[in-house]
């Protein structure tokens, strides 16, 4: 399942890796497209025991709206008994996650393969 969807300044691509649904996000995530980001994530977590990896490696900017979507997704996935893992090594993401403390809830992995085997 590969499909690209362009929304605002972001592109979303859904695929799979091992037993995980993968959402690759490219571009900027902010208030203008946070709802689309949320919709893409919700589509991947609809089933029982969802296992989702969000690959943020190609994200060039994220604000608090994007963080809110990720935290909301984490809560929903945990309620469903599932797993949410993130990929991203960009300095802007690492800094954003560290400053806000989100890295304690959602650590960033260097690759999809690393996230899947953690």
What are the roles of these predicted feature ranges?
Residues 3-4, 46:
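Short, charged helix-to-loop "capping" segments that act as catalytic/coupling loops
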Residues 114-115:
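Short alpha-helical segment
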């Amino acid at each position: 399942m590969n499909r690209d969807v362009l929304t605002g300044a972001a592109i979303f691509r859904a695929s799979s890796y091992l037993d995980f649904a993968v959402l690759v996000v490219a571009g900027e995530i902010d208030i203008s497209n946070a709802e689309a980001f949320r919709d893409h994530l919700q589509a991947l977590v609809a089933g029982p025991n969802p296992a989702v990896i969000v690959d943020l490696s190609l994200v060039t900017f994220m604000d608090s709206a994007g963080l809110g979507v990720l935290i909301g997704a984490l809560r929903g996935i945990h309620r469903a008994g599932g797993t949410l893992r993130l990929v991203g090594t960009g300095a802007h993401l690492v800094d954003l996650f560290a400053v806000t403390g989100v890295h304690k809830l959602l650590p960033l992995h260097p690759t999809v393969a690393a996230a899947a085997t953690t």
